[in-house]
Regions:
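Juxtamembrane regions of bacterial inner-membrane/periplasmic proteins
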Residues: 2-434
């Protein structure tokens, strides 16, 4: 009769094997815990509202038909708000008499206000008329502006008003900002929406930081390799190894210290955020969280704050050269107060403009014109003009008393006062002259 051979008894695991298995289980448990933690963190990631300072505005200026108006003073008010005067259009050469077309009847030889409206944030001025592309601005009833306004003045009084091409009897202007109330972090923020930004602004940031943003899943092996190669060759880093998603999770959720554990968490969070959220939402959150230096007592956080501080205008009004300058500052957000620093920033800007052309995101002729422009950025970020600080303190106290606001700092409230900023500045100037 056949007898099967005896099977050997199983060996007991050695201490080394037990240690290896235990280490593997711990690593697996740690990885699972890290994934769950990262998943929970990323849930509210791009949609979490950023804290904003509360702002106090002066009285909203108004123009009314028949009321006194000095165009020079109106132009000065617009300039103080960051509006730029457009250069006068050169006169067209006179046509030969034989070829001249019949002239259309007109009350005067000048262009009527409202024809050829200026761009948003700019104005045209003549002896009897002013046209301005109003920005959007807050009012107690909601947001206003965003349309061209044309003003005609005769004998020192408003004779005609046209808002958005339509005749009106009254028109509001943008109110001056009197004060901002910052939270404990001291952050100046003007959040932007991606859909409101021109392509040149967004492309400048992408070209500087992550030109493959829309083609990777959070990590970019090619960007890491390129950054390492440039480092090895001892050249300036034109594009870092971290993707925009990595930079964002690092800025929002991770400590500043650099070590392997933090880099691992950064990579894991970046991948999970890319899985859970839309690319455009991630990019918008990034543009609202970049550090761009300091303005007075506040840190400049986000594209909206940076454009206002460095160029005195919202990002929607930046030209190609200005947009490239801001993008070139992301890696080194220092002031440009010395010739050496301005020269270094100018070089970075022009190299970035060249990269935009290489990527096909800007035309060669357009890039050459932008490279020929001066730097344009302020030597240091523009701090808001101080106006009536005692009045601002009293207004804050009144807001807390009347509306039960516990803390204005970082609350994002908009307060509107009755103070006339123009009269206040004239009074301060008169006192200073005595």
């Amino acid at each position: 009769m056949y007898r099967s051979p005896l099977l050997p008894l199983p060996r007991r695991p050695t201490a080394r094997q037990l240690a290896a298995w235990g280490t593997g289980l711990l690593l697996a448990a740690g990885l699972a815990a890290a994934v769950v933690h990262a998943w929970r963190i990323s849930r509210h990631f791009p949609t979490a509202p950023f804290p904003q300072p509360s702002r106090l505005y002066a009285r909203i200026p108004e123009l009314t038909l028949g009321e006194p108006c000095a165009l020079a003073e109106l132009a000065s008010r617009l300039t103080s708000l960051g509006y730029e005067r457009e250069p006068a259009a050169p006169a067209a050469p006179a046509a030969p008499a034989a070829a001249a077309a019949p002239a259309a009847p007109a009350a005067s030889g000048r262009r009527a206000p409202g024809d050829g409206s200026p761009r948003t944030g700019t104005f045209n001025l003549t002896a009897e008329a002013l046209s301005v592309g109003l920005r959007r601005f807050p009012t107690p009833a909601g947001w206003a502006g965003g349309q061209p306004l044309a003003v005609e003045v005769r004998a020192g009084r408003v004779a005609r008003l046209r808002l958005g091409g339509q005749p009106v009897a009254r028109a509001a202007l943008e109110p001056p900002l009197l004060a901002s109330f910052y939270g404990p972090a001291g952050e100046e923020r003007w959040p932007v929406r991606l859909e409101d930004l021109p392509a040149r602004v967004v492309r400048g940031v992408l070209a500087a930081e992550d030109d493959g943003f829309f083609h990777h899943s959070g990590l970019s092996a090619s960007a890491i390799a390129r950054a390492a190669w440039i480092d090895l060759r001892g050249r300036e880093i034109r594009q870092g190894g971290s993707t925009i998603t990595q930079q964002l999770v690092k800025n929002l959720y991770l400590p500043r210290r650099r070590n392997l554990l933090r880099k691992t968490k950064e990579a894991l969070l970046a991948e999970i955020v890319e899985l859970r959220h839309d690319k455009r939402a991630i990019l918008e959150a990034y543009l609202n969280s970049i550090y761009w230096g300091r303005s007075g007592p506040a840190n400049l956080i986000g594209m909206g704050a940076a454009a206002r501080a460095w160029f005195g205008k919202p990002p929607e009004e930046l030209d190609l050269a200005q947009a490239a300058t801001l993008a070139a500052m992301i890696r080194a957000p220092i002031d440009a107060s010395t010739p050496a620093r301005r020269a270094a920033l100018l070089g970075r800007r022009n190299r970035l403009l060249g990269r935009l052309a290489d990527l096909g995101w800007a035309g060669r002729d357009e890039v050459r014109r932008a490279q020929a422009e001066p730097l344009g950025a302020a030597a240091r970020p523009l701090a808001p003009r101080p106006c009536a600080p005692r009045f601002a303190d009293l207004a804050a106290q009144e807001a807390r008393r009347r509306f039960g606001i516990a803390d204005l700092a970082g609350g994002g409230y908009l307060l509107f006062s009755t103070l006339d900023a123009g009269e206040q500045w004239r009074a301060e100037a008169a006192l200073a002259a005595d």
